[in-house]
A protein has these predicted regions:
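General beta-strand structural signal in soluble alpha/beta enzymes
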Residues: 56-57, 82-86, 112, 135-136
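C-terminal substrate-binding/catalytic lobe of Rossmann-fold NAD(P)-dependent oxidoreductases
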Residues: 1-22, 117-253
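Short alpha-helices
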Residues: 76-101, 249
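Oxidoreductase and adenylate-handling cofactor-binding alpha/beta cores
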Residues: 92-108, 123-133, 255
């Protein structure tokens, strides 16, 4: 977006064009990259890691190893530190999956997402003929979560772990039954899930579905001995997915600067960052107040 189109929250916040970024290398301690994982970050991540310490939220899980390698080379060559795939998944959920495996090696890890608004699935709903507007939420199955929490280590199918719920505004003259069948039978999006379609008014959509909540659970179910089942659980309930992700990025920006000052250069992930580096408090304060 053009700088003139942006309205900062505060009058003292400067806004510059992307083309002018290189002129500010001496003034920026850490650059937080907020671009998308599909098209923006694969190009921007390596390019900007050659000039700045960076933090990003690249979240295409299957491509993280190749993205790490692409960012690591320019960052290392220029003495910069680049924290990649920072957020809540990947990020906070990743850390808790690691903790679960390390602490309970005899076990199974389960990740549930939601309740949350899915932007990609919402877009798919809006492309169905007869749909004027709509959103889609991913909901974790309470029954599946309770089975996991019991320590039983169930094998769960995609349909058993999550359901999907759509809120749709019909276009004028559209047939509700036809639209519903087009949605619930859509391959790669809804056909493999139990999907509920709710038809609502435009006013209801504006009133009730403008925020971007999300969240989920990471649960490790395992045994430390045959008779003793153990369950580790980490959960998030977020009213604003982007605001929470931003909070995580800012905390890790603090760590990126500190790592760079220690001479730890190149690409890093959440697995490489000691928790104390995230805090504004000194190591002594943390030992006294939180340990």
């Amino acid at each position: 977006r053009a700088p003139a189109d942006l309205v900062p929250l505060g009058p003292r916040t400067p806004v510059y064009a992307m083309d002018a970024l290189a002129e500010h290398q001496q003034a920026i301690d850490v650059l937080i990259l907020c671009g998308g994982s599909k098209d923006d970050l694969p190009a921007q991540g390596p390019q900007l890691a050659a000039m700045f310490n960076t933090v990003d939220s690249f979240d295409t899980h299957a491509r993280i190893p190749e993205y790490f390698a692409a960012v690591d080379e320019p960052a290392r060559a220029n003495g910069k530190t680049a924290l990649i795939s920072i957020g809540w998944d990947p990020g906070m959920f990743s850390i808790n999956r690691l903790y679960g495996e390390a602490l309970l090696p005899d076990g199974v890890t389960y990740t549930f997402w939601g309740k949350g608004l899915s932007q990609g699935h919402s877009d798919a709903v809006r492309r169905v003929p007869g749909v004027k507007a709509g959103v889609q939420y991913t909901l974790p199955s309470p029954e599946a979560i309770e089975r996991v929490r019991s320590g039983a280590r169930p094998e769960l199918s995609t349909r058993e772990k999550h359901t999907r719920e759509c809120f749709v505004v019909l276009a004028e003259g559209a047939d509700a039954a036809t639209v519903e069948q087009a949605i619930v039978g859509m391959p790669n999006y809804f056909a493999d899930y139990d999907t509920t379609v709710n038809f609502i008014s435009e006013d209801e959509l504006r009133r009730d579905h403008q925020r971007m909540p999300h969240g989920g659970f990471v649960i490790r179910s395992g045994n430390t001995s045959e008779p003793h089942a153990q369950v580790i659980e980490y959960s998030l309930q977020l009213e604003s997915n982007p605001e929470f992700t931003a909070s995580v990025l800012v905390a890790y920006a603090r760590a990126a600067y500190r790592l760079n000052q220690q001479g730890q250069i190149g690409a890093k992930t959440a697995f490489d960052v000691a928790p104390g580096l995230l805090s504004i408090k000194s190591a002594g304060q943390l030992r006294e107040e939180l340990l």
